[in-house]
Amino acid sequence: MNPLIQSLTEGQLRTDIPSFRPGDTVRVHAKVVEGSRERIQIFEGVVISRKGQGISEMYTVRKISSGIGVERTFPIHTPRVEKIEVVRHGKVRRAKLYYLRALQGKAARIKEIRR
């Protein structure tokens, strides 16, 4: 990578990001702007993918809301996310859990592991 670009992006990287992987259940505290007000919205779900590296790294969180699957993709180092909490660690054998989109109910459960 170009040294100039690398030096610029190093200042933008966040250091308060917890360690999480696909299969983990996370609670994301995202800042939402509504008109002139700003509030925190909590989005809790299973991490189904993590992709990219450095400043452009992103993760996708999936949850079921009123029987409908909702997915949201967040950049890891964005200032729009106040904090990320890891609720539980899941045991999976894949890096991308896109197959969860086709599963419903008990079939979509992920076994918990102690870490």
UniProtKB/Swiss-Prot annotation:
Keywords: Ribonucleoprotein, Ribosomal protein. It holds the Pfam family Ribosomal_L19. The keyword Lipoprotein does not apply. GO terms for molecular function: structural constituent of ribosome. InterPro entries: Ribosomal_bL19, Ribosomal_bL19_CS, Ribosomal_bL19_sf, Translation_prot_SH3-like_sf. HAMAP family: Ribosomal_bL19. Belongs to the bacterial ribosomal protein bL19 family. This protein is located at the 30S-50S ribosomal subunit interface and may play a role in the structure and function of the aminoacyl-tRNA binding site. This is Large ribosomal subunit protein bL19. It comes from Streptococcus equi subsp. zooepidemicus (strain MGCS10565).
